[in-house]
Curated annotation (Swiss-Prot):
It is found in: Cytoplasm. The lineage of its organism: Bacteria, Pseudomonadati, Pseudomonadota, Betaproteobacteria, Burkholderiales. It comes from Ralstonia nicotianae (strain ATCC BAA-1114 / GMI1000) (Ralstonia solanacearum). PANTHER family: CELL DIVISION PROTEIN ZAPD (PTHR39455:SF1). Coiled coil: none annotated. One of its GO terms (biological process) is division septum assembly. One of its GO terms (cellular component) is cytoplasm. This is Cell division protein ZapD. It holds the Pfam family ZapD. Cell division factor that enhances FtsZ-ring assembly. Directly interacts with FtsZ and promotes bundling of FtsZ protofilaments, with a reduction in FtsZ GTPase activity. It comes from the Bacteria. Interacts with FtsZ.
């Protein structure tokens, strides 16, 4: 089974990008080869670039607080598992408190580190991090894997509150929708939204339909999913078959 997600606004698009980058950082950070730690470090630079949006922190804090207030009202509902509810509220409060405690721009520690800044500026140049360009970085890559990993973890540590806030907001958003089975007749599916506002759409394909690729577009009035399939040169071509899939529309 494969899951495709489509954000309806720039804020959710930014959070999805951060989630993807944090997951990539986690993966390469657990590896041992210097080249894998190079990817981890350049991924950290990408996280700083994406997280540099001025209003991202305030947006996350507002969303965490809104979710906390919404869930707090449910404490008087006897049909709600109060223990699970309290755990989520506590998680929101912790994430909000930790994010509030951060100071300066995201990645300020990296920006203030002249050595990291030199690597960051060279990393955007194709082949720009060779040993003759950055001999000190080349030497660092020959340190033991545990030492390199500890360094990257230290540099990434100030971004942990941002990561935690991003993950809980996306998790609650994904849990807010209900999935339904639909069919793309002749490879195409349309649905009127009647002005209802959504923030995220999920298209889930089972194993039989893994070869089909959804092209998704949406606005506040309707959504459109058109399936394509790659030919021998991997170029997309339209699909005329009826394709069943699961559709989920999410909104807080």
């Amino acid at each position: 089974m494969i899951l495709y997600e489509y954000p309806f606004n720039e804020r959710i698009r930014t959070l999805l990008r951060l989630e993807d980058l944090f997951e990539r950082l986690d993966f390469f950070l657990t590896q041992e080869h210097p080249l894998q730690h190079h990817v981890a470090l350049t991924t950290l630079f990408e996280i700083v670039d994406v997280a540099g949006r001025a209003d991202l922190k305030s947006d996350l804090l507002k969303e965490l607080d809104r979710q906390r207030q919404t869930l707090t009202v449910l404490r008087s509902n006897p049909q709600i598992d109060q223990e699970a509810l309290d755990a989520v509220i506590a998680e929101l409060e912790t994430a909000s408190g930790n994010l509030t405690a951060t100071h300066g721009k995201a990645g300020q520690l990296i920006a203030d580190n002249e050595w990291l800044t030199s690597i960051r500026s060279r990393a955007i140049i194709p082949g720009g991090t060779c040993e003759f360009d950055l001999p000190a970085y080349f030497a660092w890559q020959h340190h033991p894997g545990e030492r390199r990993r500890a360094d990257i973890v230290k540099w990434a540590q100030p971004l942990v509150p941002l990561r935690d806030a991003t993950m809980i907001v996306l998790r609650l958003l994904r849990e807010s929708g209900q999935s339904g089975k639909v069919i793309a007749n002749a490879g195409s599916y349309q649905q009127m939204l009647s002005g209802r506002i959504y923030q995220l759409m999920q298209v889930r394909l089972d194993d039989v339909a893994l070869g089909f690729i959804p092209e998704i577009s949406a606005n506040k009035y309707m959504l459109w999913v058109r399936f394509t399939q790659q030919d021998g040169d991997l170029r997309p071509k339209p699909v005329d078959a009826d394709i069943p899939f699961q559709l989920k529309l999410c909104n807080f």
